[in-house]
Amino acid sequence: MGAIRTPRDRWIEEGLRTLAAGGPEAVRIEVLAQALGVTKGGFYGYFRNRAALLEEMLATWEREVTEGIIARIERDGGDARERLGHLFDFVESGGLVTSAGVEMAIRDWARRDEGVARRLRRADNRRMDYLRELYGAFCPDEADVEARCLITFSLRVGEHLIVADNGPRDRADVLAAVRDRMLS
């Protein structure tokens, strides 16, 4: 009986985990193999080299933060406000690929790599388009739609970077109030 190979997705997932922890420079085949508890030989059954893995990591991230999330939200159904509520919920509880750590690592990487920057812009534009579609379904004012989209997306990108106290309220209460205001 042959040895069981480490699935391709596990290499990508571990690559994204390592990216979130240490940036693209930290994503090395030997490090990933050690984290997965395997030899690096299995890596080459899926990827030509490290650059091919990095490309697949980016493709996986882009697909999941755009069409993957949109498909989940649309599958849950409901009117635009309900779907936005599902989106807020999902972003708070999403998995590794859609995590804030991976998001921030890719944004940082994009500052130094034009190819990553193009992919990030494409993903951001797709996410903003989806928000416009949802907010536009119940906000008649185009400026209001754009403001809500920017606030919602800024919250996604930056909320975990803010370490300020929220006065007598805890962060969860404040985020719930923001959500209620955005959906009103």
Q: How would you label these PLM feature ranges?
A:
Residues 1-6:
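N-terminal intrinsically disordered/low-complexity leader segments
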Residues 10, 14-52, 56:
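Helix-turn-helix
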Residues 12, 66, 85, 125-132, ...:
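An amphipathic alpha-helix signature
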Residues 13, 59, 81-96, 105, ...:
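Amphipathic alpha-helical segments that line or abut small-molecule/effector binding pockets
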Residues 56, 70-100, 148-152:
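Hydrophobic alpha-helical connector segments
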Residues 59-66:
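Short, basic, alpha-helical segments at the C-terminal edge of helix-turn-helix-like DNA-binding modules
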Residues 98-104, 114-139, 147, 173:
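Amphipathic alpha-helical packing segments from all-alpha helical-bundle domains
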Residues 107, 142-165, 170-181:
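Hydrophobic alpha-helical segments that form the core
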